[in-house]
Structures are given as structure tokens and as C-alpha cells.
Regions:
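Acidic/polar residues in short coil/turn loops that connect beta-strands
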Residues: 20-23, 31-33
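Acidic, His- and aromatic-enriched active-site or binding-groove loops in soluble protein domains
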Residues: 28-46
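C-terminus-biased signal that marks the final domain/tail of proteins
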Residues: 2-14, 21-24, 44-201
Length: 201
């Protein structure tokens, strides 16, 4: 580990990395005593605390369900659901990293995929939307706030990167195969940060 920011516009922070290929996922965490690598059966990731904590913490939420809950409290009491989604009561809603990990895991494992790549990409961003940080809700310094600057995913088979930015929620795609992959120069694209509103009428 070195105390060198990879981007001068972003604060120095402990980074955690998730590496996935097809159906296998690992977590890489650079720590003071070296790199720690873990298999990641959950296939989501959050920042500190370390990954083993997040994995163990899921045990506290194994009772959550997408189904309508049944009365396990007391058979003698007439307890009924009065709203949809009550099977997920207790799902943490705060903005801490540990809570966002649980929320991302629950959403990922209970959401439904689509039939097309576009539907699956859209669903991916909905899953990430369940844990995104809104500007103004988490103050880190006076006048400075943590928020989700961008979200991204990639179709590794086709070499297509998809992303959204905080102010531009339209999904943007960058296709690597439309570039010269044998070239020697780095090709960069600016993040499309400004809102892109489709005016239907």
C-alpha cells in the first residue's frame, strides 16, 4: 500500500477490488500486511470493513425474504401482513458500507434478470441504484459530501462498457471493438456528466 491517490480529484481512501469472470468472483483487498484475496460467493462488494466481516454479517439477515412473511411470532395471535414487502423488514436502509453491502446482496440475489442484454444491463443499474449515495446525505468534510459519481458494468464477452453518472442517468455504452485494439495509444472517453433529458413531446 502506498499513500498515493490514483486521482487528484478524489480523496485518498482504502480501495477494495472485485474481479469477476463468467461465474467466478474474487475480492482483492490491499492491507498493511499485504494483499488479501478471497473467493466471493455473494458477488457484491463494499468498502471497509474488510470482506470477511461483510460475509459474516449476512448471517444476521438470513431471515429476510422476498415472499410474504408468515407468523412465527405466536400462533395464538392473529398477526397479518398489511403491506407488500414486509418479508424484507429489517433490511438495513442506512448509508453505512456494511448496510449497503447487505442491501446490495439482498437485491442482487432476489431481483430477476431479463431476456436481452439491454434488459439485464438496465436491471444491473437498478440493483446498484439500491445502494447509491445521494449528494448531501453523507458529509465527509465541511462542504464536502460522499456520493456516487458513476456506476459501471461490462459485458466481457463483447467488450462493451456501460456506465451512468450522477447527473446523467442515461446508460452510455463504449464498445472496445470499435477501437483499434492493436494500437499503442491509450484511448480515453470523457464521462458524460450532464443530464440528458429525452423530451417526448
Amino acid at each position: 500500500m502506498i499513500k498515493l491517490a490514483y486521482n487528484k480529484e478524489l480523496p485518498l481512501t482504502a480501495l477494495h477490488f472485485m474481479v469477476s469472470y463468467k461465474y467466478e468472483t474474487i475480492v482483492v483487498e490491499p492491507m498493511e500486511d499485504g494483499l488479501h484475496i478471497y473467493e466471493n460467493p455473494v458477488k457484491v462488494l463494499a468498502n471497509n470493513p474488510v470482506f470477511p466481516y461483510h460475509l459474516h454479517h449476512l448471517n444476521d439477515y438470513m431471515y429476510l425474504t422476498k415472499k410474504e412473511p408468515v407468523n412465527h411470532f405466536a400462533k395464538e395471535l392473529l398477526l397479518e401482513t398489511y403491506s407488500r414487502g414486509m418479508g424484507a423488514m429489517g433490511l438495513p436502509g442506512d448509508l453505512s458500507s456494511a448496510s449497503r453491502f447487505v442491501r446490495a446482496a439482498f437485491t442482487k440475489w432476489n431481483s430477476l434478470g431479463g431476456e436481452t442484454e439491454e434488459e439485464n444491463v438496465s436491471q444491473f443499474f437498478h440493483i446498484l441504484g439500491s445502494v447509491e449515495q445521494q449528494r448531501g446525505c453523507v458529509q465527509v468534510e465541511k462542504g464536502e459530501y460522499e456520493y456516487t459519481i458513476y456506476s459501471t458494468c461490462c459485458n466481457t464477452d463483447k467488450g462493451i462498457f456501460y456506465y451512468k453518472t450522477y447527473y446523467n442517468s442515461q446508460i452510455t455504452a463504449v464498445d472496445m471493438h470499435k477501437e483499434n485494439l492493436e494500437g499503442r495509444e491509450l484511448r480515453k472517453y470523457p464521462l458524460l456528466k450532464e443530464a440528458n433529458v429525452f423530451r417526448q413531446n
